[in-house]
Amino acid sequence: DKLYVLDTRNPMFEGVVDAPRLFVVDLASNEIEGTLILSEGAYHPDSYINDLRVDEKTNRIYMTDSAHAGLVVYNLDDNTSYRILDNHKTTKAEVDALSIQGKPFTMPVQSDGIALDTLNDTLYFHALSGYSLYAINTSDIEKSSNDVLAEKVRKVATTGAPDGMIFHQGNVYLADLEKQ
């Protein structure tokens, strides 16, 4: 078993200092067995790579970019990475403010939540500052233009604004920041 630890390389949200990376920890030995560094073009100077899901079927890791809307795909077969749905409406914040515990939260957060349904080979994603849950089949994910990929994305639900998602036993579970 492995643990993937994401280093955003963006301290205090002040910009990426060098390529974001994943540390791969072997849980049996408790040792770092490798470092996966994102390729140029997979991130922007203001990126904040936030959350990830490992797809053992496709041998890829899917990540969200919460600062510069988009998803990042890391291919474990050839150690390359690329962006998809970059600055696309499905990965962008839908609102400028949320109400959290009765107080306005005015920092729009782009693509944030991500969940992987390994039974149906579906990747779900959601902007934190938004109410739309989107999905794409993992077989449709490829290095392609936004327009080509956008045709394969579907809106599956209107939800609360989540800061956390998981797929478990046939269900997508989402947090709801505004209704705690």
Listing of model-derived features with the role each one plays in the protein:
Residues 1-2, 6, 40-61, 91-122, ...:
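Beta-rich, blade/repeat-based domains predominating
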Residues 58-86, 119-125:
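Internal hydrophobic scaffold segments of catalytic domains
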Residues 33-38, 81-97, 143-157:
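Beta-propeller fold detector
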Residues 126, 135-136, 140-168:
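Lipid deacylating catalytic domains
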Residues 26-30, 75-79, 137-141:
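Short loop/turn segments that connect beta-strands within beta-propeller blades
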Residues 9-59:
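Asp-box/WD-like beta-propeller blade repeats and closely related beta-sheet repeat scaffolds
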Residues 20-23, 70-72, 132-134, 180:
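A short loop-to-beta-strand structural motif that recurs across blades of beta-propeller domains
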Residues 8-10, 66-68, 76, 86, ...:
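Short loop/turn segments immediately following the C-termini of beta-strands
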